[in-house]
């Protein structure tokens, strides 16, 4: 992976998180978590972290060669198959996007 992904995930308002963060110790296997993204309750993406191109460990090793990581830092890994850009599905005002990660929870974001 390249630092270009890091740059594209780091601009203002582009990385909603919460309402909580789960400590790494509470995640039994980060390489085996089910993921789902819906827009207005229609499934757009569904997958598992086991299918990631690079493992969490590989991402951290590569990233720390470029920048130091400190406690509390968040590493954005990307999404599973089904990215809307390639299907020309774009969010519009009034849409609600829901992201779910097994064992962590779900995040609901309205589009304004």
Region spans (language model):
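Catalytic-pocket segment enriched in acidic/His residues
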Residues: 1-112
């Amino acid at each position: 992976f390249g630092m270009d992904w890091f740059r594209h995930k780091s601009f203002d308002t582009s990385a909603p998180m919460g309402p909580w963060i789960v400590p790494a110790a509470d995640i039994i296997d980060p390489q085996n978590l089910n993921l789902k993204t819906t827009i207005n309750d229609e499934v757009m993406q569904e997958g598992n972290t086991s299918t990631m191109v690079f493992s969490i460990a590989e991402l951290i090793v590569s990233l720390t060669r470029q920048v130091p990581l400190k406690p509390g830092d968040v590493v954005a890994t990307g999404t599973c198959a089904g990215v809307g850009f390639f299907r020309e599905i774009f969010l519009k005002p009034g849409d609600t996007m829901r992201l779910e990660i097994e064992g962590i929870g779900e995040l609901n974001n309205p589009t304004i």
